[in-house]
Amino acid sequence: MKAAVITKDHTIEVKDTKLRPLKYGEALLEMEYCGVCHTDLHVKNGDFGDETGRITGHEGIGIVKQVGEGVTSLKVGDRASVAWFFKGCGHCEYCVSGNETLCRNVENAGYTVDGAMAEECIVVADYSVKVPDGLDPAVASSITCAGVTTYKAVKVSQIQPGQWLAIYGLGGLGNLALQYAKNVFNAKVIAIDVNDEQLAFAKELGADMVINPKNEDAAKIIQEKVGGAHATVVTAVAKSAFNSAVEAIRAGGRVVAVGLPPEKMDLSIPRLVLDGIEVLGSLVGTREDLKEAFQFAAEGKVKPKVTKRKVEEINQIFDEMEHGKFTGRMVVDFTHH
């Protein structure tokens, strides 16, 4: 089968490879689509260690082709997912308390185990979430990562209907955060991005206010116009966005961090204490979060913007990603092989 494999010089080689036989509790998916995520870029570039030889990809949707011994949660013919959260240990304090993505022995698709950017992929059946009927698999691929990540982040922000949520970064993650915030949580949304194209798209999606921080001070405007945001979700990978988010929040507000810039953020301790501000990290989502995120997409409340590409274009896609050359998500199409 054809697979996108990480090489030692930090590129991707599309080559023929064979998967091992299924073990107890596993299923084999015939892949339909696999989205390309910024995390794949980090893994490919060796930012998390040398992963030479690993099949990349963790935004996969496929049809169950075969199930191993002991599988009860999936059957042949089901459409199911391959996500970054590939499996947890199942018995630690995090796994048993609904915080499974924080499991210290977690496996991640396309990083610690072979991923979904291939014609076939092995999953642990109990950790592979079924896709609801009527949800386009290309669209579903974006929900497995970008969708569930932003849905969970908005959930963690504890935003209430009619409250102001400021979203920093309106790329592949941010535009979905905006849709979940508006169409599921019924919040008022402020979109902040340095790219006017992304802001125009945010406006189309129903943003109540858009700000380009290159031209104006986002935090100052948010404080002046609405008295500060009730919560902020930061998907941008710039330290300046995190610092602005803290300044843009009102007393008692929450800053939810999603993007991963390498630097440290500045945090005024008196502001934190005297204004009772919370700063929280939110990492992807649990299986239950993904099930909910899929359902809202199936109901048409969230529509990821996806562009289908061939697996042979994978290095070009990563190059475009590094230079911020596209809006929405790029999805590799395996349905025509």
UniProtKB/Swiss-Prot annotation:
Gene3D superfamilies associated with the record: Medium-chain alcohol dehydrogenases, catalytic domain (3.90.180.10), NAD(P)-binding Rossmann-like Domain (3.40.50.720)
Residues that hold Zn(2+) 2 according to the record: 89, 92, 95, 103
Cofactor needs: Zn(2+)
Miscellaneous notes: In Z.mobilis there are two isozymes of alcohol dehydrogenase.
Subunit structure: Multimeric (with different ratios of monomers).
Organism whose genome encodes this protein: Zymomonas mobilis subsp. mobilis (strain ATCC 31821 / ZM4 / CP4)
Family membership noted in the UniProt record: Belongs to the zinc-containing alcohol dehydrogenase family.
Name of the protein described by the UniProt record: Alcohol dehydrogenase 1
EC number: 1.1.1.1
Transmembrane intervals: none
